[in-house]
Amino acid sequence: MCSLITQLCDAGQLADYVGLGWLNAVSSQPYLVQALGLQPPPRRVDVDAAFRDAKGLHGHQPWVATPLPGQTVRALFIGINYYGTSAALSGCCNDVKQMLATLQKKGLPINEAVILVDEDNFPGRTDQPTRDNIVRYMAWLVKDAKPGDVLFFHYSGHGTQCKSRGDSDEKYDQCIAPVDFQKSGCIVDDDIHKLLFSRLPEKVRLTAVFDCCHSGSIMDLPFTYVCSGGEQASGTPHMKRIREGNDVLGDVMMISGCADEQTSADVKNTATFGTGSTGAGGAATQCITCMLMNNQSLSYGKLLIETRDMLKRKGFKQVPQLSASKAIDLDQTFSLTEMFSVDRSIQ
């Protein structure tokens, strides 16, 4: 199956990500995430240079679907297994396959996709997930975005922390680790925020999924989901402002695999989640894709609660987080394309 899909991509045809996602990784080995530990603060990202580099970049159409009239749908997928290093993982590229399969199955009409993975022969792969490539393709994702456009971002790999470079709210910055992080350094949350949001206009919808350790606030968004009585309690859920000065014009929602202080677990056999996939993969990705595929009318609040409940039933201690650029009305039906209804009582 995998070799056939690779041949189709090489011939310029479209990949069947649904088939690949549902039958992938039958020979994958189980893996456990080894925490990277505190990393040295990396050099700052030159945001202006990143956008200059992004001008000539293009993605590819991964599948055919009914388009959204007058709207562009663009997506960036990053999966890193760190092959041949002391940081090696086994399921992050599978997570990308699973997410692609889910979005194809749901019919999201992506006009342009970029896939940065370190797995050889990955169908539709754009390039390696180096620090430079991740930075410039983050800029590519949002460049020239206009009101009504829809963007999607998925990262599966190592997440870690470094001492804060001056964020007044946090002692540590959260980071993602590119495939070459040992040589080139990580990418911190401050720079992720600047790359994705500093030039994002109003009425652009962006959904992000981070399946990595220490990812709770990795986009530095101003609002987060809270529940009275604790994260796993049954109290009244609502959005709460946790940051000042980081407001974002677009409608951005992020689901992260765990809180800032937690690690994000991985599963030996994703078939136990009932998503149709097999082999190694991220627990949060598997739960989120299962929720998206099996529940057509979940609210934003229910999407998070049921993802948390599914992980808890499977014996995982991590608590996925939901954060956003606005105080989302948590009773609104979840959508990858629609603008938010906002709870005006929360400032």
From Swiss-Prot:
PTM annotation, UniProt: Auto-proteolytic cleavage of the propeptide after Lys-55 and between the large and small subunits after Lys-268 is required for catalytic activity towards large protein substrates but is dispensable towards small oligopeptide substrates. After processing, the propeptide and the large and small subunits remain associated by non-covalent bonds. In vivo, the unprocessed enzyme appears to be the predominant form.
GO MF term list: cysteine-type endopeptidase activity; cysteine-type peptidase activity; metal ion binding
Subcellular location field: Recycling endosome
Active site: H158, C213
Spans through the membrane: none
Residue ranges, annotated region (Regulates substrate access to the active site): 1-70
Stated consequence of mutating K268G: Loss of autoprocessing
Annotated positions for site Important for Arg/Lys-specific substrate specificity: D95, D211
Activity control mechanisms: Activated by Ca(2+). In response to calcium binding, the 280-loop, a disordered loop consisting of residues 269-275, undergoes a conformational change which stabilizes substrates in the active site. The binding to the substrate triggers the release of the N-terminal region resulting in the activation of the enzyme. Proteolytic cleavage is required for catalytic activity towards large protein substrates.
Disulfide bonds: none
Activity-pH behavior: Optimum pH is 7.7.
Example GO BP: proteolysis
Matching InterPro entries: Caspase-like_dom_sf, Metacaspase, Pept_C14_caspase
Outcome (variant: D95A): Loss of autoprocessing and catalytic activity towards substrates
Root EC class: hydrolase
Propeptide residue interval(s): 1-55
Keywords recorded for this protein, A-Z: Autocatalytic cleavage, Calcium, Endosome, Hydrolase, Metal-binding, Protease, Thiol protease, Zymogen
Function of the molecule: Cysteine protease that cleaves specifically after arginine or lysine residues.
Record family assignment: Belongs to the peptidase C14B family.
Protein name: Metacaspase-2
Native source organism of the sequence: Trypanosoma brucei brucei (strain 927/4 GUTat10.1)
Upper lineage: Eukaryota, Discoba, Euglenozoa, Kinetoplastea, Metakinetoplastina
Gene symbol of the encoding locus: MCA2
